[in-house]
Amino acid sequence: MVLVTLLGLSWFCSPLAALVLDFNNIKSSADVQGAGKGSLCASDRDCSEGKFCLAFHDERSFCATCRRVRRRCQRSAVCCPGTVCVNDVCTAVEDTRPVMDRNTDGQDGAYAEGTTKWPAEENRPQGKPSTKKSQSSKGQEGESCLRTSDCGPGLCCARHFWTKICKPVLREGQVCSRRGHKDTAQAPEIFQRCDCGPGLTCRSQVTSNRQHSRLRVCQRI
């Protein structure tokens, strides 16, 4: 009789025990999923320190762990404490302070929210230096140049091998090159001369027998 009673109780309790185990498994899975995503949120203010409100297109927003230095970001709230979002990258505050201090004078709240942007001058690529010089800073003979306006009086900017330097304008009797003449083929010059000075022209030198030589010199017009 006792054996029959025990068998009956075990048969009755087995489904109940299985139901309790299934409920515990479901609860544990939900806890793990909730712990992985964090609590639901509507904005960053709903999350605790060190977290931000992360939103996906097809899921509800939840609190996610903040991102460390050199991680991608869309706003400063995404970055961990002590860092800010600069040019879409989490950056330590001490690395941005010189630029921020220099550009926030007289601009209250310029870096308060959103992504911190570097000034346009900081991001602008370094190009060629300005060639506008005052008269006192004009290039002297032998100094590098880009154009004749970079050189001082009586000088021109001419090619010297694979660079350009300031050279003296040619005087009367000096050998010259007649550049831009269509009748003769011109090869690339790696050693250019300046043009003849004012009142002079580059012409073939006349020899004693009044024949034109191949040598050209600066002569009076």
Curated annotation (Swiss-Prot):
The lineage of its organism: Eukaryota, Metazoa, Chordata, Craniata, Vertebrata. Residues 145-218 are annotated as: DKK-type Cys-2. Interacts with LRP5 and LRP6. Pfam families: Dickkopf_N (PF04706), DIKK1-2-4_C-subdom1 (PF21481), DIKK1-2-4_C-subdom2 (PF21479). This is Dickkopf-related protein 4. Belongs to the dickkopf family. The C-terminal cysteine-rich domain mediates interaction with LRP5 and LRP6. It comes from Mus musculus (Mouse). Residues 1-18 form the signal peptide. Antagonizes canonical Wnt signaling by inhibiting LRP5/6 interaction with Wnt and by forming a ternary complex with the transmembrane protein KREMEN that promotes internalization of LRP5/6. DKKs play an important role in vertebrate development, where they locally inhibit Wnt regulated processes such as antero-posterior axial patterning, limb development, somitogenesis and eye formation. In the adult, Dkks are implicated in bone formation and bone disease, cancer and Alzheimer disease. Residues 41-90 are annotated as: DKK-type Cys-1. GO terms for biological process: negative regulation of hair follicle placode formation; negative regulation of Wnt signaling pathway; Wnt signaling pathway. InterPro entries: Dickkopf_N, DIKK1/2/4_C-subdom1, DIKK1/2/4_C-subdom2, DKK1-4, Dkk4_Cys2. Keywords: Developmental protein, Disulfide bond, Secreted, Signal, Wnt signaling pathway. Its main location: secreted. CDD domains: Dkk4_Cys1, Dkk4_Cys2. Disulfide bonds join 145-157, 151-166, 156-194, 176-202, 196-218. Residues 128-139 have a biased composition (Polar residues). GO terms for cellular component: extracellular region. Residues 101-143 are annotated as: Disordered. It is found in: Secreted. The keyword Signal applies.
